[in-house]
């Protein structure tokens, strides 16, 4: 954000709305390239043009765009575009990378003003992402129903452009965005989130996709506040849009004028909402009547206000006592633990059946084995196989790699209620390591283990750093120590360390 302020020197009151001239500045592409090297490589593969990035190509691109008589595209010949010539794909992607930086400038300037002491909108429910873990432990077991709605797609390209026009008031920039989208997608009018990320700049498309989903979520949060009379998380700069304020005002009038008598049907003081992996997840403590009303609300909102076709079958309602929610790499559900209490009054005794709701988090072992199979640690049945691509490394490096993966998975899934599934994962990694070493030394697994013994694999069984700290706090024979090892332990860094969680 400081780099934007130094390079751009924009007047926040006027000039930040006119972003089109920035596409002709070389430092924009330099900033985008530096950002990609530092951050985006964590999540996305190289698209094939990163090694071709140079200042010479940027200058050539700017010169081509600056020639006004060549800014007419031919729809009949998308591969030989007069603007970009034979380097159509390369130049289109470079423009997308630069434009992704440009459209974020208004938000970056607002964040800079906040960091310099400007007043930030207050919220009584502004929480960190790490509040997920207390929510799972303290509140999840009290919920009854969960609603999972697949966010409808394909999304028309024009809808993405229209969603951005209320943030960027520069018409030239919007025309450039529209031109780039249609040009790079080969004039195909529809895209899906997964397809767009694979063929277009990930940073730009994630920005456009999140801005689009934020539109209907803002209206949902408004109605949710009106129905439950609870404050929700402030969205800050993402709610500064005149068009959708008009929609919210209209919906508010309809809500109060037409449905005031039935307001009690929507009241739910215990409702939670989150968007995760292309799904809108709504959980509630109330009855099935209320959750079904929210189901048809989602369908109608997408169809009549955002022109996205959605069917009620894409919205599923499940009871948490009979269904496991796939969230953050865990299968979370509410388990009923039956218990019998004997009560005696004078000479009469009674047996009282009592069921206690508890949180049950399980490891999706089938999906995890599928991820290990894709990574070539085992076959589809879970049988360990060797890793031939690592066979050229030293023995110590091979063992360190396998041990690191095993510890990361154990660290991530330490919040599981039953850790027996982790033993199978460790078994797969341990014997995959042995088979890789045996393949390197051109020996069988049995002969290799007989020759060196199993001591060299004891690192798979040594305690982690966190377990060592816990053992220092509680003695090994202490009762609380045994309870800690059997119970769930949530580590705050698991949000970003495990790449195998995204099984899809």
UniProtKB/Swiss-Prot annotation:
TM spans (from-to): none
Annotated keywords: Chloroplast, mRNA processing, Plastid, RNA-binding, tRNA processing
Places the protein is found: Plastid, Chloroplast
Keyword Membrane part of the UniProt annotation: no
Gene Ontology BP term (one): mRNA processing
Gene Ontology molecular function terms on file: RNA binding
Gene Ontology, cellular component aspect: chloroplast
Family annotation (InterPro entries): Domain_X, Maturase_MatK, Maturase_MatK_N
Predominant subcellular localization, coarse grouping: plastid
Any Pfam family the entry gives: Intron_maturas2
Task of the protein: Usually encoded in the trnK tRNA gene intron. Probably assists in splicing its own and other chloroplast group II introns.
PANTHER family with a match to the protein in the record: MATURASE K
Record family assignment: Belongs to the intron maturase 2 family. MatK subfamily.
Record's protein name: Maturase K
Gene name as annotated: matK
């Amino acid at each position: 954000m400081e780099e934007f302020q130094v390079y751009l020197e924009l007047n926040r009151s006027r000039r930040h709305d006119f972003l089109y001239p920035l596409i002709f500045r070389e430092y924009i592409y330099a900033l985008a390239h530096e950002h990609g090297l530092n951050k985006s490589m964590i999540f996305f593969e190289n698209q094939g043009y990163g090694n071709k990035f140079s200042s010479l190509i940027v200058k050539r691109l700017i010169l081509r765009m600056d020639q006004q008589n060549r800014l007419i595209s031919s729809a009949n010949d998308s591969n030989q575009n007069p603007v970009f010539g034979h380097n159509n794909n390369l130049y289109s992607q470079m423009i997308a990378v630069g434009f992704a930086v440009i459209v974020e400038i208004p938000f970056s300037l607002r964040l800079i003003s906040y960091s310099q002491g400007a007043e930030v909108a207050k919220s009584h429910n502004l929480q960190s992402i790490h509040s997920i873990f207390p929510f799972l432990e303290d509140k999840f077991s009290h919920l009854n129903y969960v609603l999972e709605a697949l966010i409808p797609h394909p999304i028309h390209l024009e809808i993405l452009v229209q969603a951005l026009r209320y943030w960027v008031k520069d018409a030239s920039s919007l025309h450039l965005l529209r031109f780039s989208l249609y040009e790079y997608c080969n004039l195909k009018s529809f895209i899906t989130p997964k397809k767009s990320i694979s063929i277009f700049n990930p940073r730009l498309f994630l920005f456009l996709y999140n801005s689009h989903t934020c539109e209907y979520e803002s209206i949902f949060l408004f109605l949710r506040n009106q129905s439950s009379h609870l404050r929700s998380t402030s969205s800050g700069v993402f709610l500064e849009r005149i068009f959708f304020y008009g929609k919210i005002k209209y919906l508010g009038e309809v809500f109060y004028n037409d449905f005031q008598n039935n307001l009690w049907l929507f009241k739910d003081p215990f409702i939670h909402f989150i968007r995760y992996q292309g799904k809108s997840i709504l959980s509630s403590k109330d009855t099935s009547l209320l959750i079904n009303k929210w189901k048809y609300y989602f369908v109608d909102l997408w169809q009549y206000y955002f022109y996205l076709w959605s069917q009620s079958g894409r919205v599923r309602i499940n009871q948490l006592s009979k269904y496991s929610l796939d969230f953050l790499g865990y299968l979370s559900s509410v388990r009923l633990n039956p218990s019998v209490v004997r009560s005696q009054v004078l000479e009469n005794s009674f047996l009282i059946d009592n069921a206690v709701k508890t949180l049950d988090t399980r490891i999706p072992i089938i999906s995890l084995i599928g991820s290990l199979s894709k990574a070539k640690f085992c076959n589809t049945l879970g049988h360990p196989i060797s890793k031939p691509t690592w066979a050229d490394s030293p023995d110590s490096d091979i063992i360190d790699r396998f041990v690191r993966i095993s510890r990361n998975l154990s660290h991530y899934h330490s919040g599981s209620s039953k850790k027996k599934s982790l033993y199978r994962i460790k078994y797969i990694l341990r014997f995959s390591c042995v088979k890789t070493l045996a393949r390197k030394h051109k020996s069988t697994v049995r002969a290799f283990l007989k020759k060196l013994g199993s001591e060299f694999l004891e690192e798979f069984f040594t305690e982690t750093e966190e377990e060592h700290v816990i053992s220092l706090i509680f003695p090994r024979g202490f009762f609380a120590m045994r309870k800690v090892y059997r119970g769930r332990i949530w580590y705050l860094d698991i949000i970003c360390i495990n790449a195998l969680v995204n099984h899809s």
